[in-house]
Structure formats: structure tokens, C-alpha cells
């Protein structure tokens, strides 16, 4: 599901145009001379924020958005792709304007600037502040995911389980906001990413006393601090929701 076209990597508008002239795929690096917005407007097909983020592109190429969109939409999910955070923010803030919104704990959402990015017309609730009817039945539940499969599944692991609960039942609409680093070839690799990439990073961030926080891999431990208490795999939208969608952003975000 990835293109085999050669990549042209650069850090300027001239580089992006140089790539486009012979029909190459342009990858903009954001640690150079130009901002993400300038690179995108100059024709960048993808952006990377660190040198380490280049490795998946070397191994697999740029994602074929149309194929991934089809994988999710044939399962009934909504799907929208934005090249950059700056492109995605207006869609998210406009969608949530005038609505009640609950947010799941997410490094991706924090990197996007939420909840501060919302307008004053949006009633926002962080799910760890208080529980109750507002959290359970908002107009929109905004979350991220530990992994997305290119075959159209969404994978999340949770400790308190209030985050995955909000993606399964109660809200009228659920939006998963994810960076390209969350994409995996299939369901098996998506589960592996959730267990051996996202969970260890979160355990370390939260200073949990678990083996994965030390060596970065899942031991299926029984530690009291274990944050892998439940796993949710969305194979399609919950029947009770009006809409469940994926917003994919062409930049690495979160864990």
C-alpha cells in the first residue's frame, strides 16, 4: 500500500519544486531553513520532524493515502488526510465549534495544542478531571490511537480504560487523530506497535514501575503499575455512534 517512487528529500521551497519537476515524491525536513507551512505550500508530499523519522520512508516509501482511505471507508469509518498539523487544525476546531467535546488523554492532542486550540464556543471536558454524564455523552469524543493498520483497524491499549470507553459507547461522534508514525502494515503489527512502542513510552513518561519502562518492550507483566489493562480494536464504527472517523496527519505525532 506504499508507493515505490523515488524520494527527493530537502529543506527548502526550491528543493520541493526540484522534486516535482521530474515527478519525484518530495519530502520536506522541518529542521532546515523553511517552516512546515512553507514546505507544504511548495509541494511537499510529506514532512518529517527528526532524522529518525526518515527511516520508515527509506524502508517503505510514502503512504498511498487513497489506498489507506479505502481500507477504512469500506469498513464504514470516515477518513480525512491532512499533510500537516496546520492543515488539520481548522477542520478539527470547526468540527468541534459549538459542541460539547470530551478529550481522551493523548500526547498527539497536546502536540496539536488542545484544548487551548478550541474556540470559546466549544465546551471541553478532559476525561481525567471528573467523570459523569458529560464525559459519557458528549457530542464529540476526540482521541488518538496507539496504532492504525493499513487494513483499516484502530488499536488502543488503556490502563484506567476511560479513554477506550469513550471511543466505544456514549458520544455521538468519535474522531481519532493520528500522525503517520501510527500506521502499521496490518493488524498484527498494529497490536505489536501498541504493546511494544506506545505502551512502553507511556509507561516511561508516567514513571511507572514496569519492565517495559526500563527496556522498551512488553513483558506481559503483572506489575501493579501495568498500564496495559485492556485493548480495544475498532474493526468498524460502533453501531451507537452517528459517525466514527480517522483524521490522519502526514507528520509524526505522539507515541
Regions found by a protein language model. Give the residues of each.
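N-terminal active-site beta-alpha-beta segment that forms phosphate/nucleotide-binding
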Residues: 65-142
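Acidic, Mg2+-coordinating phosphoryl-transfer loop and its flanking beta/alpha structural elements
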Residues: 8-48
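Short, well-ordered alpha-helix to beta-strand connector turns
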Residues: 23, 44, 98-99, 138, ...
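Short, structured coil segments at secondary-structure junctions
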Residues: 22, 42-43, 75, 121, ...
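Short acidic capping loops at alpha-helix termini that bridge into adjacent secondary structure
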Residues: 2-7
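Conserved phosphate- and dinucleotide-binding cores of soluble alpha/beta proteins
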Residues: 140-255
Amino acid at each position: 500500500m506504499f508507493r515505490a517512487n523515488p524520494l527527493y528529500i530537502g529543506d527548502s521551497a526550491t528543493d520541493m519544486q526540484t522534486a516535482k519537476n521530474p515527478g519525484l515524491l518530495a519530502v520536506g525536513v522541518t529542521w532546515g531553513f523553511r517552516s512546515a507551512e512553507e514546505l507544504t505550500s511548495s509541494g511537499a508530499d510529506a514532512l518529517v520532524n527528526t532524522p529518525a523519522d526518515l527511516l520508515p520512508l527509506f524502508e517503505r516509501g510514502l503512504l498511498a493515502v487513497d489506498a489507506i482511505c479505502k481500507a477504512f471507508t469500506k469498513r464504514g469509518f470516515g477518513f480525512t488526510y491532512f499533510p500537516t498539523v496546520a492543515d488539520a487544525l481548522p477542520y478539527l476546531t470547526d468540527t468541534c465549534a459549538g459542541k460539547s467535546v470530551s478529550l481522551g488523554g493523548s500526547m498527539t492532542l497536546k502536540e496539536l495544542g488542545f484544548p487551548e486550540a478550541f474556540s470559546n464556543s466549544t465546551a471541553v471536558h478532559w476525561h481525567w478531571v471528573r467523570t459523569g454524564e458529560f464525559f459519557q455523552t458528549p457530542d464529540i469524543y476526540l482521541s488518538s490511537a496507539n496504532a492504525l493498520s493499513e487494513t483499516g483497524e484502530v488499536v488502543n491499549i488503556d490502563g484506567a480504560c476511560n479513554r477506550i470507553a469513550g471511543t466505544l459507547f456514549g458520544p455521538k461522534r468519535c474522531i481519532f487523530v493520528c500522525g503517520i508514525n501510527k500506521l502499521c502494515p496490518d493488524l498484527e503489527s498494529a497490536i505489536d506497535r501498541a504493546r511494544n512502542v506506545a505502551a512502553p513510552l507511556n509507561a516511561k513518561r508516567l514513571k511507572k514501575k514496569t519492565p517495559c519502562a526500563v527496556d522498551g518492550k512488553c513483558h506481559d507483566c503483572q506489575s501493579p503499575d501495568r498500564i496495559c489493562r485492556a485493548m480495544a480494536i475498532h474493526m468498524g464504527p460502533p453501531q451507537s455512534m452517528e459517525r466514527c472517523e480517522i483524521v490522519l496527519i502526514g507528520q509524526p505525532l505522539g507515541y
